[in-house]
């Protein structure tokens, strides 16, 4: 309806201009329609537009003749002659103002009819109507519709997210139900007989009598293998059991009695049960205060004990011929452990442990980038989350995208060894590459060429770390003297004592636009190699980790060290600001993952021990004693968008831990897996709707895992 109103207004406006003989306005209005509307159409519609324009001008000429305004007709040809004289369809129309009765002329009679005029108006109206319906709405006018559509898509995504997690919980429940029959079948011999379940209702003397008979039976049985050493012997009769404690202790007693029955291989367990029954009966008759009902109950208990011993002995006897030697394997039913309830997996076993009932992330997919053929050193996502830059030990740089498909955008091989890599912040098409010969190169990933190469320092040729300020105006560069140990050693020598690779170094600030050095930071107490650097969100703070185990926090407005403290025994391998930027996290050569308060120098917030495959040095073993050892160079950990979870390296893939807990060990939430070689660097991009985890390993493989976060 809105489109029809607009079309009606356009047609009415054209007719009004013709009625007042405003040829200039008519031409301008049609030119406006051509520029704003008709120019967006395909070329196949150009003949139609030209015919409509010709008919519009003829309609104007006919109107001037019908209203006896020949002067306006002559004015039309005077102004339009240069445009129309070369067009064949206008060749006969130049005589129109001079004909006495043009409506009777066979050439023009059709145009003076009412039918032709109505047909033209309807054709113009229909053409504009179809054009408005098919033409895309301008972006500014489509804002409200886009907002509504975006909100609708977000609501649908949230509904699908909840359905996905609900299905995951249902799958977990069904798997648990499938495992229960197997567990019950495996634990059938641990089922408590009635006399044990009712033991808490027996008197103290009855309980002591049952326990004494059990001990007597165990004392007469020879010990079998290591299993007997694991069964403690009771030295005194237990006291009356409370109702709350009855079932667990009763179950333990049942297990011990079963093992005791199993140990009597050379004797008939039936006779032992009969002796027990006689003993129970004798004690029952000798007690003057017992009732007849209590005596019958004890006799029933004796029968049940007899059945229990008989069943246990017969089952073990079936297994006995298969065993070789005196140390026969006991019945599996007797030592089957019940399945423990689901618990959180601790750091001691990130690959094992139970599955959490509700995972914080769902793995939507995992892809592999395999265009590197040697160990990866760095793998970083740009700030837009669309491209990845990866660098291996052979100096091969790959820039590739993964959305919607994985595709290599640029590739380069460096003649000199490369040690560091960093994306530029403002112009995210640029890469900073630090070499092992004292140079930093600025590489354009779209033009696929080096823009410039600057010489940092000849005395300190190793560019260990690069960090670009978030404002894009500058970057810091860590230069160090030659290493005491090689970066990648194929003979795998002894790594030596921690912190032995302490060499002099410098921390420099460079201008991004001019590519000139601005200043050199002071490194107290002495110049030392800086292994890792990181800015906060606005670039006002810079945190560094050095080979001497010291973390230094620099004020980038004053260009001085605000505080420093010894953080690790050995080198600091990786350091990052926390999500709220009130603390920093670090990983060191000592295998510690520590959180530090930046408002109080050296104040430790938390400390955790990480596995060696998460901190390095990383070792890849091969045939004939071949070993490849790589010292950490890239980022060893990365955070999610809210800083609640951390991604680290491992021998088989990335591992995600939950942060902020009160436990003394980190809680492992998800193991990404997928690698056959140790992972040496990670990155976590949250620029897109779904999180993207990157894990790069020593065999040159890079795994890209897409995660969907569970929103509470």
Swiss-Prot record:
Cross-referenced Gene3D superfamilies: YVTN repeat-like/Quinoprotein amine dehydrogenase (2.130.10.10)
Subcellular location, in the record's words?
A: Early endosome membrane; Late endosome membrane
Q: Where is the composition biased (Low complexity)?
A: 230-243
Q: Which GO terms describe its molecular function?
A: phosphatidylinositol 3-kinase inhibitor activity
Listed GO biological process terms: early endosome to late endosome transport; negative regulation of phosphatidylinositol 3-kinase/protein kinase B signal transduction
Q: Which SUPFAM superfamilies match?
A: WD40 repeat-like (SSF50978)
Where is there biased composition of kind Basic and acidic residues?
Answer: 297-308
Q: Which GO terms describe its cellular component?
A: cytosol; early endosome membrane; endosome membrane; late endosome membrane
Which keywords are on file for this protein?
Answer: Coiled coil, Endosome, Membrane, Phosphoprotein, Repeat, WD repeat
How does the record say this protein sits in the membrane?
A: Peripheral membrane protein
Spell out which residues are annotated as carrying Phosphoserine. Answer: 221, 253, 258
Q: Which residues form a coiled coil?
A: 148-180
User: Where is it chiefly localized?
Assistant: membrane
Annotated region (Disordered), positions in chain: 230-336
Q: What does this protein do?
A: Functions as a negative regulator of the PI3 kinase/PI3K activity associated with endosomal membranes via BECN1, a core subunit of the PI3K complex. By modifying the phosphatidylinositol 3-phosphate/PtdInsP3 content of endosomal membranes may regulate endosome fusion, recycling, sorting and early to late endosome transport. It is for instance, required for the delivery of cargos like BST2/tetherin from early to late endosome and thereby participates indirectly to their degradation by the lysosome. May play a role in meiosis.
State the oligomer form and interacting partners.
Interacts with WDR81; involved in early to late endosome cargo transport. Interacts with BECN1; negatively regulates the PI3 kinase/PI3K activity associated with endosomal membranes.
Family to which the UniProt record says this protein belongs: Belongs to the WD repeat WDR91 family.
How is this protein named in the record? WD repeat-containing protein 91
Name the source organism: Pongo abelii (Sumatran orangutan)
Give me the gene this protein comes from: WDR91
């Amino acid at each position: 309806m809105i489109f029809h109103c607009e079309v009606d207004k356009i047609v009415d406006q054209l007719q009004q201009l013709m009625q007042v003989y405003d040829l200039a306005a008519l031409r301008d209005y049609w030119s406006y329609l051509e520029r704003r509307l008709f120019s967006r159409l395909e070329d196949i519609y150009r003949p139609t537009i030209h015919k409509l324009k010709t008919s519009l001008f003829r309609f104007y000429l006919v109107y001037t003749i019908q209203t006896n305004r020949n002067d306006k007709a002559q004015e039309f040809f005077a102004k339009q002659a240069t445009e129309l004289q070369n067009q064949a369809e206008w060749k006969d129309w130049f005589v129109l103002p001079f004909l006495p009765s043009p409506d009777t002329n066979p050439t023009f009679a059709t145009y003076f009819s009412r039918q032709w005029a109505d047909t033209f108006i309807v054709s113009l109206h229909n053409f504009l109507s179809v054009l408005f319906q098919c033409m895309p709405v301008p972006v500014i006018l489509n804002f409200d519709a886009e907002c509504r559509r975006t909100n609708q898509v977000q609501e649908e995504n949230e509904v699908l997210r909840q359905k996905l997690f609900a299905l995951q919980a249902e799958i977990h429940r069904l798997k648990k139900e499938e495992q229960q029959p197997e567990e019950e079948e495996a634990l059938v011999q641990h089922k408590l007989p009635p006399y044990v379940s009712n033991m808490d209702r027996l008197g103290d003397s009855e309980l002591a009598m049952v326990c004494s008979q059990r001990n007597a039976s165990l004392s007469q049985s020879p010990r079998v293998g290591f299993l007997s050493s694991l069964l403690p012997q009771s030295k005194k009769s237990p006291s009356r059991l409370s109702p709350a404690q009855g079932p667990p202790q009763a179950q333990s007693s049942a297990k011990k009695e079963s093992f005791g029955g199993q140990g009597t291989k050379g004797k008939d367990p039936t006779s032992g049960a009969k002796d027990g029954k006689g003993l129970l009966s004798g004690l029952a008759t000798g007690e003057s205060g017992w009732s007849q009902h209590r005596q019958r109950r004890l006799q029933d208990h004796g029968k049940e004990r007899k059945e229990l011993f008989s069943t246990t002995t017969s089952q073990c006897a079936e297994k006995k011929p298969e065993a070789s030697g005196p140390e026969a394997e006991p019945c599996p039913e007797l030592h089957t452990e019940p399945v423990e309830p689901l618990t959180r997996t601790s750091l001691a076993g990130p690959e094992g442990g139970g599955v959490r009932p509700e995972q914080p992330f769902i793995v939507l997919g995992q892809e592999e980038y395999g265009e590197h053929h040697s160990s990866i050193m760095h793998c970083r996502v740009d700030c837009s989350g669309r491209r990845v830059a990866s660098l291996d030990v052979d100096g091969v740089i790959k820039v590739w995208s993964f959305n919607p498909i994985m595709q290599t955008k640029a590739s380069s091989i460096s003649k000199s060894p490369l040690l560091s890599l960093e994306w530029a912040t403002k112009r995210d098409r640029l890469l900073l590459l630090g070499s092992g010969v004292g140079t930093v190169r600025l590489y354009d990933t779209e033009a696929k060429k080096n823009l410039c190469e600057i010489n940092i320092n000849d005395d300190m040729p190793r560019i260990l770390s690069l960090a670009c300020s978030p404002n894009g105006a500058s970057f810091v560069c860590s230069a160090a003297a030659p290493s005491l140990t090689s970066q990648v050693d194929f003979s795998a020598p002894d790594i030596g004592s921690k912190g032995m690779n302490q060499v002099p170094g410098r921390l420099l600030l460079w201008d991004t636009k001019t590519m000139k050095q601005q200043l050199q930071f002071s490194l107290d107490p002495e110049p030392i190699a800086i292994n890792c650097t990181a800015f906060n969100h606005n670039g006002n703070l810079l945190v560094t980790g050095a080979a001497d185990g010291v973390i230094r926090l620099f004020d980038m407005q004053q260009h001085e060290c605000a505080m420093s403290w010894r953080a690790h025994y050995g080198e600091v391998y990786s350091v990052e600001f926390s999500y709220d930027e009130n603390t920093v996290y670090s990983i060191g050569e000592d295998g510690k993952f520590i959180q530090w308060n930046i408002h109080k120098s050296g104040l430790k917030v938390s400390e955790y021990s990480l596995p060696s495959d998460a901190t390095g040095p990383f070792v890849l073993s091969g045939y004939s004693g071949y070993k490849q050892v790589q010292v950490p160079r890239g980022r060893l950990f990365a955070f999610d968008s809210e800083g609640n979870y951390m991604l680290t390296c491992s021998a088989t893939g990335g591992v995600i831990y939950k942060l902020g807990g009160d436990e003394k060990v980190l809680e492992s939430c998800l193991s990404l897996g997928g690698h056959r070689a140790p992972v040496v660097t990670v990155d976590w991009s949250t620029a897109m709707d779904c999180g993207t985890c990157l894990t790069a390993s020593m065999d040159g493989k890079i795994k890209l895992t897409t995660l969907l976060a569970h929103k509470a």
